[in-house]
Curated annotation (Swiss-Prot):
Record's keyword annotation contains S-adenosyl-L-methionine: no
A GO CC term attached to the entry: cytoplasm
Protein name, per record: Endoribonuclease YbeY
Cofactor note: Binds 1 zinc ion.
Alphabetical list of Pfam families matching this protein: YbeY (PF02130)
Transmembrane regions: none
Localization (cell): Cytoplasm
Chain's role: Single strand-specific metallo-endoribonuclease involved in late-stage 70S ribosome quality control and in maturation of the 3' terminus of the 16S rRNA.
Species this chain originates from: Burkholderia mallei (strain ATCC 23344)
Enzyme Commission designation: 3.1.-.-
Cofactor(s) required for function per UniProt: Zn(2+)
Keywords: Cytoplasm, Endonuclease, Hydrolase, Metal-binding, Nuclease, Ribosome biogenesis, rRNA processing, Zinc
Amino acid sequence: MTVEVGADENPDFAHDETDGAGDESDDEDAQGRDPELDLAVQYGDEIGDAQRKSLPKRKVIAEWLEPAIFSDTQFTVRFVGADEGRALNHSYRHKDYATNVLTFAYGEEPDGVTVADLVLCCPVVEKEAREQGKTLVAHYAHLLVHGALHAQGYDHERGEEDAAEMEALEIDILAKLGFPNPYR
């Protein structure tokens, strides 16, 4: 789900654990270099120390996101509990339930950098993985790739053709990362 908001409208998502992670990738931008990923990872108040240890680490998140970015990006990935997930979904989408991933796309900076926050609701992600018979790691990877594509303008809710394009990209990126098709 993509939410278009102005950067000044959402101060709760300050980029606080930031350092670049522009490693090798198959995609190069117009200047002939790999897109750079500036990544911060945050945890909501409901995410305790024990749960943090079980979540994907920053390096792994960067490895999953890098093949899904097509230009320089500045992402904050925030892991939240059910209460924060529900509050955000209600505030920005007027839906009174927590959803698996929300993408807050702030658009492109003048220098062409795509800026977005990807918010993952841990209890929802865990429940879906169990119900769908997926590993938790594969489901987190899928939702991060999904959110990254939303941040760059892909939208499965615009119609069948757009949905098919986004789904095909997700399947291809996840296959390159060694994950199975998430839609089977």
